[in-house]
């Protein structure tokens, strides 16, 4: 979970990016108390901003994905690797803030990829992300071959997997509020099963087998494992900075570093897969046959790439600032919002019903419970530091 550590910099402009994760018992001088108060406030601001980014990014990406499938004339089976590639190929937009940080701070080396974190965990992170992306590609192909309610119930299991992996990899302690939050998040995801798919248009019902369901389980497992391994890398970096006398606590820029380098490697692999499979020939055909025109096609693809990067900054930022569990809760609790927006924009005859209301209410309560957990932990830390 996210914790507090004294700030190493006195520049007020650095408060947003300087998010400490570890707790140490400090002397309760007026200066330290003021610093802790500012640090807590800035961490809350960061959590709020990352939550907004995660929700906004996922909503825009799914809406544009729906728009893409509604107006393409080619077979749905075409372009599955391309759609997966869009989730990572937009990373160059993060290079500008990343490089500006290095220029302004005059930083000479990377933090995560400079040998200060375990190469084993970095290798696992790369492997898990690659497997997850290919699962997403196959999952995109078979999603509508199973009833949407089956898909939703299967995919919400990622919350359970995140809970298990966080306990094993991150050694997180849970309380009753954690389980209440997760139960409400599962309900939020489960009650969207009575609505249509929030990521692509509905197709006719088809027979499905256990192999297809296993693909959905695989995507859920690897996404959960990915978040927990990323958290483990961040924890190792924090531990290194704590034991090193000449190292400041890592700032939010490590989130950009993590996303950029992971996306770079996966992009290269997926581009190679697209070229080998011949999907790059389909892109020109899709552009020519797109019912809204080639300009709309390009805007849709670019918009998805940018939206996914916004989503990843929010999700990985929440992993850095809080935990993998909270990050996944936010991801799942966005589904009812996406479902409502899709109904409003693409299916106007589909009215707001009791199931959508329950899903939205459960999502709001789930997030509120976890925010209460964070607030309570910080209050307990304050009591310990003043005692």
UniProtKB/Swiss-Prot annotation:
Keyword check for Transport: yes
Disulfide bond positions: none
Subcellular location: Membrane
Membrane topology of this protein: Multi-pass membrane protein
Domain of life, per lineage: Eukaryota
Species whose genome carries this gene: Arabidopsis thaliana
Protein's name according to its UniProt entry: Putative purine permease 15
Keywords: Membrane, Transmembrane, Transmembrane helix, Transport
Any one GO MF annotation of this record: purine nucleobase transmembrane transporter activity
GO cellular component: membrane
Transmembrane domains' residue ranges: 44-64, 84-104, 122-142, 150-169, 179-199, 210-230, 252-272, 306-326, 329-349, 354-374
